[in-house]
Curated annotation (Swiss-Prot):
It comes from the Viruses. It holds the Pfam family Flexi_CP. Transmembrane segments: none annotated. This is Capsid protein. Belongs to the potexviruses coat protein family. It comes from Potato virus M (strain German). Keywords: Capsid protein, Helical capsid protein, Ribonucleoprotein, Virion. It is found in: Virion. One of its GO terms (cellular component) is ribonucleoprotein complex. Residues 1-24, 32-54 have a biased composition (Basic and acidic residues). The lineage of its organism: Viruses, Riboviria, Orthornavirae, Kitrinoviricota, Alsuviricetes.
Length: 304
């Protein structure tokens, strides 16, 4: 009896559960549409983010390549000017009050070099010359032109203290005798040659520009290739204390020109100084004659 009752209850429960399962509604297409839409939205957002990231990278690459392109590439950089100043350690800092202070290269670089030559006219000498030429009637704006004409005149004639000039130096609507100008140069610069040395680079460029060597080059025994060398101040062409042309030297003197100039200079000086052997030029000493010719022995020179 009890077993049959249990079986009946069990069968009833099974039937009830089957009815419940059979009563549950089936899912429709609408149930899946919302889920698929959210998943598609997430996928499209991820794709869009990836595309934007790729575009940003491409834009960055484009800008990078644009910055690197160009027709100019600086090579062999060796910049020193404008570099950051070094900070020395405390025990290495200079003491300018001590005469045995060791200056550093950095300190030496701050002392600007000034080219000085005692063998040419100074700035004070030239100022005296300019003022005196103005006083003689040369317009201020033409004083340098007159001085350069005088220097070029000496290139052809001579810069000797014994030079007796001829002619005049001109400017627009005016002129002054060469005697007056050279007298001022000799007086205010002590010697005419000191002024000519100051303008030696200018004279050199003028000769090369006009192909105008010293007029007496052939008579002085120079060869055609060395025709620009025979002027008194040739050895000051490369002197940095002299007045420099605006663009610099057209070319430097050649070694051959230097040899030719120095050879002629040696001969000329020995000829001019033959009386220097006398301690006095009185007739009792000289006998009324010039001194002996000064000779130089070139036998020991290397001429092989």
């Amino acid at each position: 009896m009890g077993d049959s009752t249990k079986k009946a209850e069990t069968a009833k429960d099974v039937g009830t559960s089957q009815e419940k399962r059979e009563a549950r509604p089936l899912p429709t297409a609408a149930d899946f549409e919302g889920k698929d839409t959210s998943e598609d939205t997430d996928g499209r957002a991820a794709d869009a983010d990836g595309e934007m990231s790729l575009e940003r990278r491409l834009d960055s690459l484009r800008e990078f390549l644009r910055e690197r392109r160009g027709a100019i590439r600086v090579t062999n950089p060796g910049l020193e000017t404008g570099r950051p100043r070094l900070q020395l350690a405390e025990n290495m800092r200079p003491d300018p009050t001590n005469p045995y202070n060791r200056p550093s290269i950095e300190a030496l670089s701050r002392i600007k070099p000034i080219a000085i030559s005692n063998n040419m006219a100074t700035s004070e000498d030239m100022m005296r010359i300019y003022v005196n030429l103005e006083g003689l009637g040369v317009p201020t704006e033409h004083v340098q032109q007159v001085v350069i004409q005088a220097v070029l005149f000496c290139k052809d004639a001579s810069s000797s203290v014994f030079l007796d000039p001829r002619g005049s130096f001109e400017w627009p609507r005016g002129a002054i005798t060469a005697d007056a100008v050279l007298a001022v140069l000799k007086k205010d610069a002590e010697t005419l040659r000191r002024v000519c040395r100051l303008y030696a680079p200018v004279t050199w460029n003028h000769m090369l520009t006009h192909n105008a060597p010293p007029a007496e080059w052939a008579a002085m025994g120079f060869q055609y290739e060395d025709r620009f060398a025979p002027f008194d101040c040739f050895d000051y062409v490369e002197n940095t204390a002299a007045v420099q042309p605006l663009e610099g030297l057209i070319r430097r003197p050649t070694p051959r020109e230097k040899v030719a100039h120095n050879t002629h200079k040696d001969i000329a000086l020995r000829g001019a100084n033959r009386n220097q052997v006398f301690s006095s030029l009185n007739a009792e000493v000289t006998g009324g004659m010039n001194g002996p010719e000064l000779t130089r022995d070139y036998v020991k020179s290397n001429r092989k």
